Amino acid sequence: MSRPLTPMEHLLAKYEGDVNGFGHHAAHGELLVPGESLLTDVEVLDVYTDESRMPADVEQWNRLPLHTILSRLVKISPQRLHVNPGQPFDTEFDFTELGDAAAQHMRICGCGERPSATREARRWADAAGRRFFVVRHKDNARLRGCLTAGAIGDALGANTENLPMEVIHERHGPDGITDLPEKPDITDDTQMTLFTFEAVIRWHVLERLSGPADLTAVTQNAYQRWLHTQKTPWEKARGALSTLEEPDGWLITHRDLFRMRAPGLTCTSALQEFARTGEQASITKPVNNSKGCGGAMRVAPVALADEDPQMVFALAAANAALTHGHPSGYLSAGVFAVLVHQLLRGKGLPEALEVAVDSLVRREDHEEVVAAIEHAVELAALGEPSVARVEELGRGGVGDTALAIALYSALVTDDPNEALLISVNHGGDNDSTASMCGNLVGALHGIGKIRPDWVERVQFRDVIDRMVSDWELENSPAAPVAQEWFTRYPPS
């Protein structure tokens, strides 16, 4: 006796025509849905099975693999799924029936059950007044500001990293560093931030094509490409699991990246270990006991990966743990990414810090990072910034002190350009602290508040602008489907 059909199999039987091909359709069937973004407050999700059934004046819909839609259903939980609305044979399913079917469908197609990023969206209406959902573009002035000001801070400190203030005063005068150097080149901080951003874009492409994907694994591959730029032959940098004969993607084609700008030995040795063994480090399987700032200084783009700050914290901490195994190394990265996440969404710094600390104190071994944050806030409340107060927070070479200096500098003044100079004028790892401060104040104030001459001169400004535009396009209802795009951002 044949079993009864599930609601999802009814859908496939009615509109795909072959119930016995359920697993096949799970992997290869495509439906049209409103944009890629599905919100938690969707009550009725409209789905079309082919373009011929859609109203002629609807333009903002995307074709997605069926399993991608189902992976979203598990998280967004609409009350009803409406198939081919307005058509002679339209169908509605109650989600109380669909929930189990969607989860089962994900298992059949091997998608796993990790919720993918829920991307913020807004309502649009077609000519007939029907409402549907598309991705809302973020305030790109904030994202451009975040990444550009981060590069500026990096360049401000590039030539004076770990030099005593006495030497900085000898070179730059009694006020210390007050302007970009004549050749405002970035260091490994911005290099790795760009490869992180590339990983986020490529991960998004992968999710769009294939369903939920592991951002940390995609980022590991990106960092192996960065390792190749640091004079490591590709056959030794690519990793034991890779079969690529050459590194792929658009970012790696920029030859100016192939310069050793004081790369952190902790990062390079951890990446070399992965290349040798193929074993990815994690919080539960640390590669070392380092709490260096190299884990935190690169994670600003992880703020783009999810709407949930708790998820952003987890993703950033996992990112940092690829190379830095001490809790203060990866927890400071989690805090930093959540700060950027909140600032990009228009929150003030105190409110952003409250959200970040709430995420932090849920984790084990958070005490050292909490103490560093509290110290930074206390000093900022005193006003009157000084080198002595910056150096009271530490040298910035480890994650918690780098975070503290960046945070102090952003809190103690409302001028983002002054904040950058405060964060770079100390005798420690000042390119990293200024880069992190730049990420914060750029996200807080937007690129329009950053000195225009600095914005124009800093290295890789054109690359940052292009990648921000590409991120916007990848998140739009018109996300590219041409092979050229997948060559630019391979889904891996």
Question: PLM features: what roles do these ranges have?
Answer:
Residues 116-492:
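Structured, active/binding-site neighborhoods that engage oxygen-rich ligands
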Residues 1-121:
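An interfacial alpha-helical scaffold signature
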